[in-house]
């Protein structure tokens, strides 16, 4: 039952954060910099695949070890590191191949990925600890 709590809480926190941040901060920033290269609406399939893979990674590498060790702080750190790595891969690849990419996008997205991933992992472990 505990792994399901970790997965569910991680997903809820992550998706709420994304639902707030993406339309209000990240999309306007991306539109400003890469403008016409963006789709009018999201491709939900690839987005869902990212969320499944990333939340699975957060569960395996951050929340399960954090819960096992009794440390939500370790989950936060490991989650932030995984978020940094995941978002850095995307950003550095995009910066390498896209004409209109910028260091501003790279920094903003990597900071966001680190923060939301760490926060999601931390909250998930705290909630799971409360139910243990």
Task: Please report, for each region that a protein language model flagged, where it lies by residue.
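Juxtamembrane/disordered regions of integral membrane proteins
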Residues: 1-132
């Amino acid at each position: 039952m505990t792994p399901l709590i970790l997965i569910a809480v991680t997903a809820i926190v992550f998706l709420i954060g994304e639902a707030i941040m993406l339309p209000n901060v990240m999309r306007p920033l991306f539109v400003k910099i890469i403008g016409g290269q963006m789709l009018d609406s999201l491709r939900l399939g690839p987005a869902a695949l990212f969320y499944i893979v990333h939340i699975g990674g957060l569960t395996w590498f951050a929340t399960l070890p954090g819960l096992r060790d009794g440390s939500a702080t370790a989950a936060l750190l490991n989650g932030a590191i995984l978020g940094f790595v995941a978002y850095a891969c995307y950003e550095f690849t995009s910066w390498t191949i896209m004409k209109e990419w910028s260091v501003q996008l790279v920094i903003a997205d990597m900071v966001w990925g680190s923060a939301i991933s760490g926060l999601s992992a931390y909250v998930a472990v705290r909630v799971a600890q409360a139910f243990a």
